Regions:
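Short glycine/proline- and aromatic-enriched beta-strand/turn motifs that initiate or cap beta-hairpins
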Residues: 1-40
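Sequence/structural signature of outer-membrane beta-barrel proteins
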Residues: 2-8, 35-44, 62, 71-79, ...
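Flexible, surface-exposed loop regions and adjacent strand-edge segments
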Residues: 14-16, 154-156, 187-196
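Residues that define the transmembrane beta-barrel architecture of outer-membrane proteins
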Residues: 14-18, 47-51, 64, 80-86, ...
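Residues on the lipid-exposed face of transmembrane beta-strands in outer-membrane beta-barrel proteins
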Residues: 20-26, 53-59, 70, 86-92, ...
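Repeated loop/turn-to-beta-strand initiation elements of outer-membrane beta-barrel proteins
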Residues: 28-34, 62-68, 94-99, 133-139, ...
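Detector for outer-membrane/organellar transmembrane beta-barrel domains
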Residues: 84-151
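Outer-membrane beta-barrel "beta-signal"
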Residues: 93, 164-172, 177, 197-215
């Protein structure tokens, strides 16, 4: 991808990222996997890559699909930013809703940043529109609430991210933006928009290609 976007925020200072993962899913619904990507938050930062580990259980009950699991985010060069989340997704037809809750975070995020269970959350709403050509249009709205993202990623406490995407045969294109609110000091948008060429208050165009292999 030309830009690693996570919850509306660039994780690669709007530069290219190479990503990959391995998943195992059992017929019972249990799954486990790992995923990695290069990351960068400033031209002289200490980050090199993100390595995630996750596991969960997914299934269906009539017309309703569900998925619940745990995701641990590990950042190679600075263990102080490692954290974990519990997530749950419910889907009906082409619509799905996901809630992610902060479960654990390293205690050295910064002064006053010892975060406890569910002190930050992310809610996402997604809708997929299949086209006759085989392509799919995706509509997404997400909302982050809590102080953790300010400590971890410099973002203001609460914000929305919105995007529209189209995907076919592994190719994808997306237009995304965020609506960053003010932090407690009232200067969050200006400070964060200028940090490390992130420009997360601007509209971003993202393209990518992915492929799957079965072992």
């Amino acid at each position: 991808t030309n830009n690693y976007i996570w919850r509306g925020l660039t994780q690669s200072i709007s530069e290219a990222a190479v990503q990959g993962g391995i998943d195992y899913a059992d017929d019972s619904g249990f799954y486990i996997g790992t995923w990695a990507s290069n990351v960068s938050y400033d031209s002289d930062d200490v980050y090199s890559y993100e390595h995630d580990i996750y596991f969960g259980y997914a299934g269906e009950a009539g017309d309703i699909s569900y998925d619940i699991g745990y995701l641990y985010y590990n950042y190679d060069s600075n263990a102080g930013f490692d954290f974990g989340e519990l997530y749950g997704t419910v889907g009906v037809g082409n619509f799905s809703a996901t809630l992610s809750l902060l479960v654990n975070a390293e205690p050295d995020e910064g002064p006053g940043q010892d975060f406890g269970f569910a002190e930050a959350s992310y809610t996402s709403l997604d809708y997929v529109i299949p086209l006759e050509s085989g392509a799919e249009i995706g509509l997404h709205a997400g909302f982050h609430e809590g102080d953790f993202m300010y400590a971890f990623n410099g973002a203001t406490d609460d914000y929305w991210d919105l995007n529209i995407s189209i995907a076919k045969d592994g190719f994808s294109a997306m237009v995304t933006t965020t609506t960053l609110g003010d932090d407690d000091d009232g200067d969050g948008v200006e400070d964060y928009a200028s940090m490390g060429a992130r420009d997360n208050d601007e509209i971003k165009f993202v393209v990518g290609y992915s492929m799957d292999f079965e072992l």
